[in-house]
Amino acid sequence: MTQRIASHSRKTAETDISATVNLDGSGTSAIETGVVFLDHMLTNFSRHSGIDVQLRCSGDLEVDDHHTVEDVALVLGKAIVDALGDKKGIGRYGWAIIPMDEALAQCSIDLGGRSYCVFRAEFQRPVIQGLSTEMVEHFFVSLSRTMNANLHLAVLEGRNTHHMIEALFKSLAYAMKQAVKVESTEIKSTKGAI
């Protein structure tokens, strides 16, 4: 099987980001975004999806975290879709419901080339370790856009904002693990392409 590894970078007046992913990795990561809680979430995503992620970002955090969070998602999504190649044989779909103490989150994903994100969650804390909680939804919307994926994410239960967000990222990780797994030699679409 061809190695499913890809890199992508993006440099603007607001951010300078580079990312490399290995879809058939072991969940190792080296992530440095300047946003401590985002680093923690992406490390969890890597570990639980089994996707190796190397990502470095220098952003205009003196303004706020918006550009960094959005652009990190855009670059990560592009690296993942590039690593998928023609998507031949992948599971395409994945889903997970993940608990973290009192929090319960779910994610369903379709890597079929149709970008759409539905997000349902409300957080009580406005910021956690540099990450504006309003940016959590924007992260997933931006990721789905460049990954050409249909994402449905929801927090079903929860009070602790940290637990709720971490359960969301872990549910994405386990859904991705299923969706990127090579299961056959066929393309899972009646169109013959995804």
UniProtKB/Swiss-Prot annotation:
Pfam families: IGPD (PF00475)
Molecular function in Gene Ontology: imidazoleglycerol-phosphate dehydratase activity
PROSITE patterns: IGP_DEHYDRATASE_1 (PS00954), IGP_DEHYDRATASE_2 (PS00955)
Enzyme category, top tier: lyase
Location relative to the cell: Cytoplasm
This protein's pathway: Amino-acid biosynthesis; L-histidine biosynthesis; L-histidine from 5-phospho-alpha-D-ribose 1-diphosphate: step 6/9
GO CC, one annotated term: cytoplasm
InterPro entries: IGPD_sf, ImidazoleglycerolP_deHydtase, ImidazoleglycerP_deHydtase_CS, Ribosomal_Su5_D2-typ_SF
An annotated GO BP: L-histidine biosynthetic process
Gene3D superfamilies with a match to the protein in the record: Imidazole glycerol phosphate dehydratase, domain 1
CDD domains for this protein: IGPD
Keywords annotated in UniProt: Amino-acid biosynthesis, Cytoplasm, Histidine biosynthesis, Lyase
Catalytic activity, as annotated: D-erythro-1-(imidazol-4-yl)glycerol 3-phosphate = 3-(imidazol-4-yl)-2-oxopropyl phosphate + H2O
EC identifiers of the protein: 4.2.1.19
Family indicated by similarity: Belongs to the imidazoleglycerol-phosphate dehydratase family.
PANTHER family from the UniProt entry: IMIDAZOLEGLYCEROL-PHOSPHATE DEHYDRATASE (PTHR23133:SF2), IMIDAZOLEGLYCEROL-PHOSPHATE DEHYDRATASE HIS7 (PTHR23133)
Protein name, as recorded: Imidazoleglycerol-phosphate dehydratase
Organism, scientific name: Chlorobaculum tepidum (strain ATCC 49652 / DSM 12025 / NBRC 103806 / TLS) (Chlorobium tepidum)
